[in-house]
């Protein structure tokens, strides 16, 4: 049976070392929809640059992603493990630039750091140092999550997504109440 639903787009942001986790986030979002979409009247849409961006020329690649995806999404799930990513000319990495844009727009950014063991052969010392510096700065200004295994990430996300959806619904309700109160004030002034 059809139902009305508010749709929130969730941008999945991470450097390239977390492909399995990116898929797990997509699965967690689909699982959330299967369990909660009807009761909450909310549908979550996973968005990734590799599936939702459009090729564009004569534009900085991250700028195209920012315009096409970052500006259009409602929630960001950002993850890091062994690296920060590639400098964009504006920020330390594409993921960092996406997070910065979300925070500047006042939109929720849920950040997670993987504690999964690292194969020494995969370590890029420069990237690891950049990640540690970013992590240290982030801990000063944000409450972040962590996860070890992919299953743990899915489990944590199921709880965090519910809390985030309820916060967004509450914020939307508050905006609606504020608009009604403002309209009532205008009507009162017009009657004077």
Model-derived features with residue positions:
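Conserved N-terminal substructure of TIR/SEFIR domains
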Residues: 1-79, 105, 181-192
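Alpha-helical structural signal in soluble globular domains
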Residues: 24, 28-35, 101, 133, ...
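Conserved TIR/SEFIR loop-to-helix hotspot centered on a Trp-containing motif
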Residues: 57-61, 82-104, 123
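A general structural detector for well-ordered alpha-helical segments in enzyme core domains, enriched
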Residues: 65, 95-98, 130, 134
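C-terminal interaction surface of TIR/SEFIR-family domains
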Residues: 115-192
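Generic beta-sheet signal
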Residues: 49, 79, 112-114, 147
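Solvent-exposed loop/turn segments at secondary-structure junctions
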Residues: 17, 53, 83-85, 116-119, ...
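A short helix->loop->beta-strand "cap" motif at the edges of active sites that frequently abuts
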Residues: 104-114
């Amino acid at each position: 049976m059809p139902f009305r639903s508010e749709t929130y787009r969730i941008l999945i942001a991470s450097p390239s070392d977390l492909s399995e986790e990116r898929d797990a986030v997509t699965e967690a979002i689909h699982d959330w929809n299967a369990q909660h979409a009807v009761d909450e009247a909310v549908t979550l849409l996973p968005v990734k640059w590799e599936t939702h961006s459009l090729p564009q020329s004569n534009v900085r690649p991250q700028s195209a992603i920012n315009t096409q995806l970052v500006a259009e999404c409602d929630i960001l799930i950002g993850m890091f493990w062994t690296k920060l990513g590639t400098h964009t000319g504006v920020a330390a990495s594409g993921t960092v630039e996406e997070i910065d844009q979300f925070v500047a727009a006042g939109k929720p950014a849920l950040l997670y750091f993987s504690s999964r063991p690292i194969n020494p052969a995969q370590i890029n010392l420069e990237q690891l140092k950049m990640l540690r510096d970013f992590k240290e700065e982030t801990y000063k200004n944000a409450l972040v999550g962590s996860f070890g295994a992919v299953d743990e990430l899915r489990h944590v996300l199921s709880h965090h997504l519910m809390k985030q959806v309820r916060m967004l619904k509450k914020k939307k309700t508050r905006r609606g109440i504020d608009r009604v109160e403002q309209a009532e004030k205008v009507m009162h002034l017009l009657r004077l």
